[in-house]
């Protein structure tokens, strides 16, 4: 059976990256929440 996690840096950046988050209203809400919480890393 194939494992579910097949790492790819490009796919990771494109799907969960900062620029994707900034590009949508809800993505910006996610970043705002993570900033408020004090996360060291805001996105992938």
Swiss-Prot record:
Pfam families xref list = Ribosomal_L34
Name of the coding gene = rpmH
- Renumbered residue ranges of the record's region Disordered: 25-44
InterPro entries associated with the record: Ribosomal_bL34, Ribosomal_bL34_CS
What's the source species for this entry?
A: Phenylobacterium zucineum (strain HLK1)
The similarity comment for this entry is:
Belongs to the bacterial ribosomal protein bL34 family.
Report the PROSITE patterns cross-referenced here.
Answer: RIBOSOMAL_L34
Q: Where is the composition biased (Basic residues)?
A: 31-44
Q: Which domain of life is it from?
A: Bacteria
The name this protein carries in UniProt is: Large ribosomal subunit protein bL34
**Which Gene3D superfamilies did the record assign?**
1.10.287.3980
